[in-house]
Structures are given as structure tokens and as C-alpha cells.
Regions:
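Feature for soluble, non-membrane regions of globular proteins
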Residues: 21-227
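Bacterial N-terminal signal peptides that target proteins for export
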Residues: 1-8
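Cleavable N-terminal signal peptides
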Residues: 9-10, 20
Length: 227
């Protein structure tokens, strides 16, 4: 690259990089009031989980990216795709930011989440036998995750549905996980997600959670993953 083109490239990167203008990742408001998921998830849990835990992931992600100029301007999804090259701070906090944003958007008021679309239900029946069998397998993934982590439903590269789980704030978009794919559903099984209300009864939390799953959103994600 000749010197003039190099200068132009640097100027362009400076213009498009959000960090060059003091911008950064931010915490979006919840898509519903803090008490909207009660009695499945109580208001206090939501306020602490979103306003403190998720906010901390965002703040620490911004610090990590600011300290790594090569990452400036990359989207959250782009960071996930090359997480093996970013270091633990971006892995933990970038994963925490992506996972929680995805999690909030997966839920709605109890009883308002509808049902899986015909296409998604057909895929669930094909790959798990029935919706009830899928829910049982998903619960097993959440219970089987030792310590902190997530349970996921992903669409694999061959279009199949698969249940997986990840430790800490890893997710199936990351290039370091064993089972990569497009997530369409995920549940947080860190204790801060449920302990105020359910204490050590993770299984009860996993059972109750289906009441707030927004199947309309999950069905749209499945349709998008098929494109």
C-alpha cells in the first residue's frame, strides 16, 4: 500500500470507529418493565441482573476494547467470531453483554409468549421427538452445567436443532466452543439469574421459565437461521 492510501485508510478507520468519537457499547433498556416477568422472575432479580450485572459486563467490555485498538469498530458478533484472539476480558465481558441482550429479548410477560411456529415445532419434533421431550432435554442441559453458564438451543450448519451448554459467559457464536451454531434460545443458569427467588432450586427455575419464553421471537430467529 502506498503512503497516501495508507493515510486515507487510517483516516477512514478513525471516522468509522465508534471509539474514535467516544462512543462504545451500551446497555439497552429492558424490552418490558422490571416487574413484567413476575411471578416467574421477580422485580428485584431483574433490577439487579440487568442494572448491575449486565451493566458491569458492558462497562468492562468497553475498557477491554479501549485497551486493544485492533478491536475498535468491531461489532459484538464480530468479536464473538474471533474471540480466541481477543483475550479473556473481551471473552468474559463481551460474552456477558451478548448473552444477556439475547436473553432479555427471549422473554415476555407470562402467558404472552405464544407457541412455536409450525416450522419450528416440526423441527423440534424431528430432532427431539416432541416439545415436552425438548423441554426435558433443555432442562437437563441447564441442570448439568456445573457452576455458572448457559443452556442453548442452536441451529447447526446443516439446519438441525441441537441443545448445548457453555460455561461462564461463552456462547455458541464463539470460535472456541465445541458446538458452534446460531443460537435461537438461551437460558442463564448463573445463580444471580434466579437465586433471590429460587435459592438452590435451579430445576424449579428452569421449569417455571417456559412461562415467559417468547416463542414468537424464537420462531423468528429460527426462520432467520434457515435463510
Amino acid at each position: 500500500m502506498n503512503p497516501l492510501n495508507r493515510i486515507l485508510t487510517i483516516l477512514l478507520l478513525t471516522l468509522v470507529s465508534p471509539w474514535a468519537h467516544g462512543q462504545s457499547f451500551s446497555l439497552a433498556p429492558l424490552p418490558y418493565p422490571h416487574d413484567a416477568l413476575a411471578p416467574v422472575i421477580d422485580e428485584q432479580t431483574m433490577r439487579i441482573h440487568h442494572g448491575r450485572h449486565h451493566q458491569a459486563y458492558v462497562d468492562n467490555l468497553n475498557k477491554a476494547v479501549a485497551a486493544a485498538p485492533a478491536l475498535a469498530g468491531l461489532s459484538l458478533e464480530a468479536l464473538m467470531a474471533q474471540i480466541s484472539k481477543t483475550g479473556d476480558a473481551v471473552r468474559n465481558n463481551g460474552g456477558g453483554h451478548w448473552n444477556h441482550t439475547f436473553f432479555w429479548q427471549s422473554m415476555t410477560r407470562p402467558g404472552q409468549g405464544g407457541a412455536p411456529s409450525p416450522a419450528l415445532l416440526a423441527a423440534i419434533n424431528r430432532d427431539f421427538g416432541s416439545l415436552d421431550q425438548f423441554k426435558a432435554a433443555f432442562k437437563a442441559a441447564g441442570l448439568g452445567r456445573f457452576g455458572s453458564g448457559w443452556a442453548w438451543l442452536i441451529v447447526t450448519t446443516d439446519g438441525k436443532l441441537k441443545i448445548t451448554s457453555t460455561p461462564n459467559q461463552d456462547n455458541p457464536l464463539m470460535d472456541i466452543v465445541a458446538d458452534r451454531g446460531q443460537p435461537i434460545l438461551g437460558n442463564d443458569v448463573w445463580e444471580h439469574a434466579y437465586y433471590l427467588q429460587y435459592q438452590n432450586r435451579r430445576g424449579d427455575y428452569l421449569d417455571a421459565w417456559w412461562q415467559v419464553v417468547d416463542w414468537n421471537v424464537i420462531s423468528r430467529r429460527y426462520a432467520d437461521a434457515q435463510k
